[in-house]
Amino acid sequence: MAKNRKTPDMNLPMWFDGQNINEALFCEEFLHERRIIFANGAFFTPDGRVTDDLPLRGEIYDKLKFCAVNNIPRKITNILEVLKLEAQVPDFPPEQDRIHLSNGTLLLDGTFTKGRPAIVRSRLPVAYNPNAPAPEIWQNFLDGLLHAEDIPTLQEFIGYCLIPSNKGQRMMVIKGNGGEGKSQIGAVLSTIFGTNMKDGSIGKISENRFARADLEHILLCVDDDMRMEALRQTNYVKS
């Protein structure tokens, strides 16, 4: 029997009186059971920013489905709106001294802590393995694509993108002929960064001030097919 399923003695959850759902009380109970906050226009959990609310809606539905109420989809939407208010925190600053990974957290001083106890702004979908062998396939690929002196620069730039900081004020442009394999760098980065990376257009960002909103909470933006003409303005890109 489900945890909150109605029983003959009417032991109902405190947020359901048998006919109506109290959304505020539901959210209070939900937050006692689930580690989640709302900040800067997004939900965050120990897995990082919630980019798809369908699983969250599914969790809410599992708790509501025993209730004989009308229009459960609308009720779930209303609960999500109340949850934003109930779970809101005034400030959730980025942590620039650590990288959250699928199996723990790596500090920039080399210290690694296993587990995912804290709510974080971002978590990369890759595991930390201090004994991992050298990535020979990746190194051979870079050897065939770049000059030897350029490889450390690329590696350093990728490492810089792992932390939520723009203090370096740098953008990397990889220039070359078509068919050389440059796009494979973006494919590898997509695997490392997951939803923390966005495929975008530098031209669109430079021309549309609203395009920057798509980059909020994003660690890396990759333009895989940058236009050759000069940018009309660079104010939005620099900011």
Predicted regions and their residues:
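Short, small/acidic-rich helices and loops at N termini and domain boundaries
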Residues: 1-10, 42-74
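A short, contiguous, amphipathic alpha-helix enriched in charged residues
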Residues: 20-25, 190-195, 230-239
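Conserved nucleotide-sensing/catalytic segment adjacent to the nucleotide-binding pocket
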Residues: 211-239
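Intein-associated homing endonuclease modules of the LAGLIDADG/DOD-type, together
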Residues: 15-35, 129
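P-loop NTPase catalytic core of nucleic-acid-dependent motor ATPases
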Residues: 31-56, 95, 99-100, 105-220
